[in-house]
Amino acid sequence: MKLLTLDGFLTVLALLAALYAVLSPVQRIRLSMSWRSQLILAIPACIAILAFELFDINPPSCPSILGGLCRYLELGTADPGVPRKFAFLIAFAWLIGSVFIHRAARPTLRSLPELTQLATTLVDEEQYDDAIRLVEPHLELIAVASCRKSKIQLAHDRLKDFGPVDPQSFAAFTRPRGPGPHPYQGENLPDWAARPVRALARFVPAHKRAEEAASDMLQLLFHSNRLLDHIVDRRPHFGVALARLDVYGSTEFVGRYLTRLIATPASALYQELAGNEISESPIGYQLPERNRLLHFLFADPQNAERLSVWKPIGDYTKRLLAGDERQDYWSYLNGDPGWFENERNSDPVWNAMFFFDIMVTSAARHGIEYHMWLYYLPRFADLLEKGYDSDGSGIDKEAEFPTRAARLLYELVGFLTSWVTLYDRLPQGSRLRLMPDRHDRGSAIPHSAAIALGETLAIVLASERINDGVIQTLHDVTLRAIREIHDDGMR
């Protein structure tokens, strides 16, 4: 066994200091999270090593209870290098313990201010990957701290607000109401009896700094435009992690995030949509976990409903068709659609409609009694009709679809008719098969889709721009869908 000399021990300490100097900011913050535990381990280890090195203290003898094992554990009392050998074993055990503490270290509420400060510095210096690697493992802690939902924060707040409160105060407003078990808050106690309990709050940390730091961190993550650009281009799945946070501001972030994704044909959203066209009979599409964004939003479509994901996709598409996003887009739409099958996976309008298709069918499969704002599609149809122009050079007006805009109208009507015919594919007894008593919009998907289809057909039939052959095709597609629901639908 090698001997650990004093010079060797000092050399090891110098190497550790040098390694710390070249660590990345992310690794340094990870070390700082466990410095207390590391210090508790390092102090006795250093004292023991120095004691064995300087004073040649013999190691403790092997306990007799171990019996025959002692001959393998004892270093040999006659050997003059025994103390140094034992010092080497202590140093080795210290190394193992230090590595374990570092790997097991987790941030705490106390470390959030430092974490936020470093993340802000990294973003300001445009070191976005380092900032994301620093923050991503701790998003849950950040979200909990910002809402004051950690156990220690809840304990402090319950003690501080224990007892009767003014019915008009904010404390009364935040107290849980309704059925279900709720923590006892002493509402019916006299104030003098509740006062000693409230005094206990002084001994429980409030962690206000952690709450403020976590809120600042979320503001940075949700509102930094440069960071959002980097997320969309390089780390799109970090955007999904942020979308999962049920905190104030997440809906606004998801809106900005999805807008950037649909506006960027090479983005992860287009890639996931292109790889998610396999239907899942009888309703909806397969949502493999590799498509992280679509799987998160639509495997449980309540996530899509909570985040109102139809709005950023629908609003961007309306602006695009109105000519407010890309001035050259209508030149493209009024061109020859000969290669549309190959082009559609990069076309924003088609992908927006396909996004709605996945969303609407997933909601129907899960029995969500909401139309998921499929009424965006008649607005798309109206804008497609207003920009429709088949008078360009090289356009065959007698073709089934003279232009790409004509093909998009056909695809749009196809999506609407497929949602109407969900009525036949829904299980018996589904509430989505119920029709409203009055002629209102209602919220069931098949009924809402029928209204949207009627609005779209009215736009098409009244158009003086759309070619007659295209109008006839869309009319026939609509009536065919009606006939599929009612055998006498064509009579």
Regions picked out by a protein language model, each given a short descriptive name:
Residues 102-491:
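Short basic (Lys/Arg) and small-residue
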Residues 25-33, 61-63, 96-116:
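Juxtamembrane/interface segments at transmembrane-helix termini
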Residues 59-78:
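Membrane-interfacial helical/loop segments at transmembrane boundaries in membrane proteins
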Residues 8, 37-59:
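A short aromatic-anchored loop/beta-hairpin motif
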Residues 75-107:
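Alpha-helical membrane-embedded segments
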Residues 1-33:
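Membrane-anchoring/interfacial helices and their immediately flanking loops
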Residues 3-6, 35-39, 79-82:
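Juxtamembrane/start-of-transmembrane alpha-helix segments at the extracytoplasmic/lumenal side
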Residues 4-10, 43, 62-67:
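Globular "head" domains of long coiled-coil molecular machines
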